[in-house]
Amino acid sequence: MKKTLTSEQCDVIGQIIDRPYLALWADMGAGKTAITLHAVAELLRLGFIRRAIVVAPRAVADSTWRQEAALWPGTSHLRVVTLRGDKSVRREQARTPADVYCIGRDALAVPGLHRGCVASPDLIALAGDAGRAMLIVDEASSIKNSQSARFRALAWFRWGRVLELTGTPAPQGIGDIWSQMYLLDRGAALGKTITAFRQRYMRRKECGFGFEEVPGAAPAVLDAVRHLVLRLEAPPPCDVTYRDVYAQMGDAELEAYRRFKKSMVAEIQGREITAVSAGALVAKLAAWASGGQYCTDADIRETVRPHCRKRDELTRILASERGPHLVFYWFNFSIDDVKSAARAARKSFACFDARHPEIVDAWNAGEIDVMAAHPQSAGMGLNLQRGGHRIIWMTCPWSSELWLQAVARLARRGQAHTVEVTRIIAPGTIDERISHVLGGKIDAQKLILDELKGG
């Protein structure tokens, strides 16, 4: 069936053409990849740009843009090249004549460089004549850290056009916006430096670590950048239901968890577990709730198991529900739990690996019953809706961005079923705190996007 754009999507294409520096804050599933490719095709036809450079999460850079271009009559002629492989292969790919070059955000900077130009040879090769190139930052919230090498690498060049794409521009609040806006206007709206921005809109937290917004900062910041932002809403592509199931630890297991929380030291299966700081304790409590701990003995690299309640609950769910399941994990030891649960439920298993994009095709073809995936690698930009409609979280993230993006891998256009999202919670543990904090961040993100409706 021939694919066509909606009238609203066509209007956005016109805005991209007319506004060289633009942040498109689009709901997930709004079709921002297709919109952008059509805008690129028109800009190339008009001679406004010579090439487009797409910076994206690795899995998205490897497959999504090329596949999307091939789906549309208006973009199927675009020559899309992805830079991947070893150094010599990438060098040849950068020299290959093309309209769109895709590069993983992990390949933007040279590791270890802290001064001057930190851009990688790949990015430098693509950025030749940057004034006639269009930079497209897919999932632009990935450059929210102004100290990151990837941000400094992109900011080194003066691009002829910049388009930023994201559905989650401020997952931790308005402090995430400065670097995104700087890449568009070099600091004209929010200040030339992050320090100037913080002096005006932020203050140090009472604990002395980190910053928080001053009263009234959010609407003031959004008013200041309104001319740089285009808000694109999308109707919900499908219904989404949420439920929590509980993996209850035994009394002795829960008591051991509480002792560790208080003392920051424990012994499990003869191995020492120590939290050296408050931050380390938070991470280890989340791991404990999920059923594992990494040893802190200097000479031992081993995972020990304080309980297996989440694995058992996952086994029960997989055995009782038909259809494929996308299982998001946070700790690597959970991969073994998902694999074990799938085997016990007599279902096929695979673990998503961004280095092997063919696994996306296998999932969408219905060849995988249970796919384990980390939200940082598979949570952004991938089209997984044809492969299933059930999501299970072994461990919820603190980040609203990772949560929303991960759920949107199935809850997007083309999904034929209600998406069912299940969280496995260990009662009496940090899982409950994470769930509460996550809900607040999702609400704050929605308020920011709602502020720019019609902008």
Descriptions of predicted regions:
Residues 60-85, 184-187, 346:
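Conserved helix-turn-beta segment of the N-terminal RecA-like "Helicase ATP-binding" lobe
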Residues 59, 81-90, 105-110, 144-147, ...:
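Conserved helicase motor
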Residues 1-25:
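Conserved pre-motif I regulatory segment
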Residues 1, 17-18, 30-31, 35-48, ...:
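Conserved Helicase C-terminal RecA-like lobe
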Residues 28-29, 160-174, 182:
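Conserved helicase ATPase motor motifs in RecA-like P-loop NTPase domains
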Residues 102-108, 121-129, 144, 148-160, ...:
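Inter-lobe coupling linker of SF2 helicases/translocases
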